Amino acid sequence: MSVTSQPSLPLAVKAKSFVAYSLYIVLFSCLLPLFFGRLLYRSIKAPAYRLRMHERLGLVATKPAAGGIWLHAVSVGEVIAAVPVIKALRLQYPLMPITVTTTTPTGSARLTEMLADELGNNIFHSYSPYDWPLFVSLFLRQVKPSIYIVMETELWPVTVYLCKRMGVPVIVANARMSAKSAKGY
């Protein structure tokens, strides 16, 4: 079976998924003011944090060429696991841009440290946008990935849904997941 052709899910599963997704959107929307408050607090506490707040809203500083790879590594551990993957992708696809997203400042710092000579040379870093439709859509429209690779099991519902809707295959790398859990995605 190819990556793009997937068996159709039963209607009951689709309905449950739709309800769960809708509840997630409502809950996330209610919590959005807290996320913005946290951003503001962190930017006051660490002024350098303010310089990259826009990335959490889906706005990237440097737009890579369309059709590249989006690889997400949450924090330090995932970044350490991702660097060999990034280097292997670079060898296999030397001209394809790779956008690496992280969620934490420590993950960002570790990525910058480990790929210091390669960042900017068709490898880009951005903070991952908050998992809300507008922010993820903005990010996807700017980065225009041909594939989304997630390190471990950092699967965000809106991101996965919008990737699927835009025809961007989602690959989970270096993860442990039961067959039952995998069916939910």
Locate predicted features:
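Compositionally biased, low-hydrophobicity segments enriched in charged and small polar residues
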Residues: M1-L9, T159, I171-A173
